C-alpha cells in the first residue's frame, strides 16, 4: 500500500552558489556524513549534493510534513542498497513520522530515483507499507 509520494526539482546552480557562499556550514547543516563523503568524491560535486537535496525535499513531501513538524534535513539521508539502488535512511523526527503513518503489522519501503541533467536535478520518492510477513 502506498502511503506517500513526493517529487522535487532543483536548479544545481542554486546548490553551487550555496556551497560557494557557505561551504561546510551548508553541507554539514543539510547532509549526513555518508552523503558528504560520497558527494565530496564526485567530479560533479554540486550536482551530487543537488540530487541529495532534491531527495530530501521529495521525501519530506512523501511524509506529508515538508521540512517542518520536527523533520530536519539530516533526519533524511540518501544511502545505497547492496545492489547500488538508492533509498532513504530516516532518523529522528522523520523516522517518527514514518512510523506513525504505517498501519499495524507493516514495515516501510522507501523507493527513490534521482537524476540530473545540468542545470537541473530531480528526485522522486514513493513510501510503501509492506506486510511484515513479506
Curated annotation (Swiss-Prot):
It catalyses: apo-[ACP] + CoA = holo-[ACP] + adenosine 3',5'-bisphosphate + H(+). The keyword Transferase applies. It is found in: Cytoplasm. One of its GO terms (cellular component) is cytoplasm. Mg(2+) binds at residues 8, 57. Its main location: cytoplasm. Its EC number is 2.7.8.7. It comes from the Bacteria. Belongs to the P-Pant transferase superfamily. AcpS family. One of its GO terms (biological process) is fatty acid biosynthetic process. This is Holo-[acyl-carrier-protein] synthase. Keywords: Cytoplasm, Fatty acid biosynthesis, Fatty acid metabolism, Lipid biosynthesis, Lipid metabolism, Magnesium, Metal-binding, Transferase. InterPro entries: 4-PPantetheinyl_Trfase_dom, 4-PPantetheinyl_Trfase_dom_sf, ACPS, Ppantetheine-prot_Trfase_dom. Transfers the 4'-phosphopantetheine moiety from coenzyme A to a Ser of acyl-carrier-protein.
